[in-house]
């Protein structure tokens, strides 16, 4: 799902790597976690759309049914809100969709927990995702935004570090979107409703949890689209190689290329 890992830091080396050099960018742990997440999230999104087809309306509060006012209603086309090519299974089956969804929810939740523990133990989260005070300055954020908008990507050793927009995006997914998806999913579980209800209280009811689950899921879709676009624009072969083999060729700047 994401390309986040500890990288070789230029300041820790006697000679900083130059553009054109092959460097180790992603460990085997991150690469395995990335591709498992790709599969898990894809299955969960498609099975989630099938579950949504059973009642394509969203509400706030504890209850929601056909007579109640929905804040979002997706009109049906050919009898369903989302067509079969976007769902798992492709033909309507709420029971099967829930089985797929729950099975891969465990894969996602356990994988996230293990990755976060590993990232803390290895120091990756603090070292590579921590946003320094200087990076919070509006001028710094605006500069990085303009660089991205102009498709000016870092070269040489600078390509080994995450900029503030990348850090914000990755932290938003790791610490906001994914935990929110998992917790709101638990809140909607009938087994949880029969036991402790503190999650229901936190999210304001089962229907509010369902709405937040839907919003967070499509926030994740938005991240994927931007992530894939950046991979393509930055050089898909080099980026894919780094997430398959771990090795990344540092981009050259214009002067080096000349």
Language-model segment annotations:
Residues 1-258:
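Membrane-embedded alpha-helical bundles that constitute the cytochrome b-like, heme-associated redox core
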């Amino acid at each position: 799902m994401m390309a986040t890992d500890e990288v070789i830091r230029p300041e820790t080396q006697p000679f900083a790597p130059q553009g054109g050099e092959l460097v180790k960018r992603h460990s085997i742990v991150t690469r395995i976690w990335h591709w498992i997440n790709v599969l898990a999230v894809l299955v969960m999104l498609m099975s989630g759309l099938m579950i949504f087809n059973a009642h394509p309306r969203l509400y706030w509060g504890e209850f929601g049914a056909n007579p109640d006012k929905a804040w979002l209603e997706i009109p049906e086309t050919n009898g369903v809100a989302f067509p079969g090519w976007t769902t798992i299974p492709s033909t309507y089956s709420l029971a099967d969709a829930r089985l797929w969804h729950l099975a891969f929810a465990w894969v996602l939740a356990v994988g996230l927990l293990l990755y976060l523990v590993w990232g803390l133990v290895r120091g990756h989260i603090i070292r590579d995702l921590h946003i320094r005070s200087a990076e919070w300055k509006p001028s710094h954020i605006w500069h990085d935004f303009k660089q991205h908008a102009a498709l000016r990507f870092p070269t040489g050793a600078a390509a080994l570090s995450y900029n503030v927009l990348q850090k914000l995006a990755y932290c938003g997914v790791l610490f906001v979107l994914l935990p929110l998806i998992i917790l709101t999913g638990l809140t909607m579980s009938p087994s949880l409703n029969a036991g402790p209800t503190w999650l229901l209280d936190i999210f304001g009811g089962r229907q509010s949890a369902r709405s937040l689950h839907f919003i967070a899921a499509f926030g994740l879709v938005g991240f994927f689209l931007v992530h894939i676009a950046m991979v393509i624009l930055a050089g898909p072969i080099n980026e894919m190689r780094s997430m398959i083999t771990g090795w990344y060729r540092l981009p050259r700047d214009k002067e080096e290329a000349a």
